[in-house]
Structures are given as structure tokens and as C-alpha cells.
Amino acid sequence: MSKIYTLINICRIKFMIKVFGIKNCDTMKKTFTWLDAHSVEYKFIDYKKEGVVAEQIDIWINHVGWEKLLNTRGMMWRKIPDDEKLDLDEEIARRLMLAYPSAIKRPIIVCNDKLLVGFDADVFMTQLLA
């Protein structure tokens, strides 16, 4: 076993990677495939089934901003009534993400002090395996 691999495993044991998303989402399937192919251990939290608490959304907003978290291109966004999306700002975005967890971008990966939003194999390689 290489020293690099050993160090990576020590980091993974000490700092569990948490992956937030929706199990049946195509982007999540790509994420699971990538993580499994690179032997990355993680805990999956399905925020459609388990919900997401306001405190967690607040932490994410503080790290990356609501604009990066809110999925305004997905099907759920189109289903949200237009009057609920008027004058979109942080407070409204937060309320929408709590009411409609499927409107949160996927995946959200938390490891140590890192918060990764969306699937990007290159970012995963540098942030999760380095």
C-alpha cells in the first residue's frame, strides 16, 4: 500500500465525508459512481427523504452563498409558483430550500471545512483526494 493511499484513508477516517442530495437524481448517480470508483468512503444524506434543517442551510449559505445552492434550472424550480419566487433574495431562497429540498443543487459534499456544490470530477479529484 502506498504512503499516499494510507494518508488518504487516515484523512477519510478522521474526517468523514458527508454527501447530501437525492438518491434517484442522475447527477447524484454520477457522484456515487465517481466516489465509489475512487474508493471514497462517505455518508449519504437524502434530503428529500430526511429533510434538511434550517441550521444546515444557513451554514451552507454562509460558505458558498444562496445563489450557488439554489437550483434554478431544475424541474422543481419550474414547479414552484412564480409568486413564491418574486423578489428573490437570501431570505426567500432560504425559505424555498426549506420548503422544497429538491430545489437545492446536488450534490453537496462536506469534508472538513470544504463545501463542494455540484458534480465536478476535477474538483473532486483535487479536493477529496489531495
Regions from the PLM with identified roles:
Residues 47-127:
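Thiol/selenol-based redox catalytic cores and closely related redox-interacting motifs
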Residues 15-33, 43-47:
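Local sequence-structure signature of Cys/Sec-based thiol-disulfide redox active-site neighborhoods
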Residues 40:
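Short phosphate-binding/catalytic loops that engage adenosine nucleotides
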Residues 14-16, 104-105:
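A structure-centric signal for secondary-structure junctions around beta-strands
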